[in-house]
Structures are given as structure tokens and as C-alpha cells.
């Protein structure tokens, strides 16, 4: 399978299918530092990134904002001193789509 970070997001409409349990099991293995959370019945991907200070956390947040704009897919971002919590899910389907896994992998690449 092509690395997730090399894939592009596709337009996700309200009738797009959520990932199946089988797809979830396969895709989550490709982004091992991410966890699955369920909030208000909505499955989401989440990872906490740690930094040495607020300025580095903010720089990462800004890189992530640029990436999100390029891909037209936007995460939940919580930036605080020394860490950034990133949450991906597809708002239109209220759950996880392959796009979320692609974006999680691309987010990890921002650290490289």
C-alpha cells in the first residue's frame, strides 16, 4: 500500500462511507502514534505532540494550519505550552474517513 503521507485527500460528502472496522484496523497500524477517541458518539483520531516551549508548539501549529488549507481538510487543534493536541475526523460524516488517516500521517511528517 502507498504510504498515507503520499496520498491526497478526496472530497468527502455527507453520504461518504465511514471507514469499516477492517479498514480502521489496517489504517491505524500505519499511524502507530495516534489513538482513536470517541466524543459525543463521533470516532476521531488524536495525538499529542510535545515541544520544548510555546514558540515551537506555535510554529508546529502554523505549519499544520498551512497543511490543512492545502488539503482542504481541517483538524481540531489545541496549542498550549510545550504541546499541541491534534484531532482529525470528518465533520460531514461525523466519523472517520480515509482522509483523516492521510492527514494524520501528513501531520507526523511535519516533524521530519
Swiss-Prot record:
> From which domain of life does this come?
Bacteria
SUPFAM superfamilies named in the record: PCD-like
Q: Which reaction does it catalyse?
A: (4aS,6R)-4a-hydroxy-L-erythro-5,6,7,8-tetrahydrobiopterin = (6R)-L-erythro-6,7-dihydrobiopterin + H2O
The record's annotation in Pfam families points to: Pterin_4a
Cystine pairings recorded for this chain = none
Swiss-Prot/TrEMBL GO biological process terms: tetrahydrobiopterin biosynthetic process
Q: Name one GO molecular function term.
A: 4-alpha-hydroxytetrahydrobiopterin dehydratase activity
Annotated EC: 4.2.1.96
Keywords of this protein's UniProt record, alphabetized? Lyase
Name the protein family: Belongs to the pterin-4-alpha-carbinolamine dehydratase family.
Q: Name it.
A: Putative pterin-4-alpha-carbinolamine dehydratase
Supply the source organism for this entry: Shewanella baltica (strain OS155 / ATCC BAA-1091)
Q: What is the lineage of its organism?
A: Bacteria, Pseudomonadati, Pseudomonadota, Gammaproteobacteria, Alteromonadales
Amino acid at each position: 500500500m502507498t504510504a498515507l503521507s503520499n496520498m491526497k485527500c478526496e472530497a468527502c460528502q455527507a453520504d461518504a462511507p465511514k471507514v469499516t472496522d477492517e479498514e480502521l484496523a489496517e489504517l491505524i497500524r500505519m499511524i502507530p502514534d495516534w489513538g482513536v477517541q470517541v466524543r459525543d458518539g463521533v470516532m476521531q483520531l488524536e495525538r499529542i505532540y510535545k515541544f520544548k516551549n510555546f514558540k515551537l508548539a506555535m510554529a508546529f501549529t502554523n505549519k499544520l494550519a498551512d497543511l490543512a488549507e492545502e488539503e482542504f481538510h481541517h483538524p481540531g487543534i489545541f496549542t498550549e505550552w510545550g504541546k499541541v493536541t491534534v484531532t482529525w475526523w470528518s465533520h460531514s460524516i461525523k466519523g472517520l474517513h480515509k482522509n483523516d488517516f492521510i492527514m494524520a500521517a501528513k501531520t507526523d511528517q511535519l516533524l521530519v
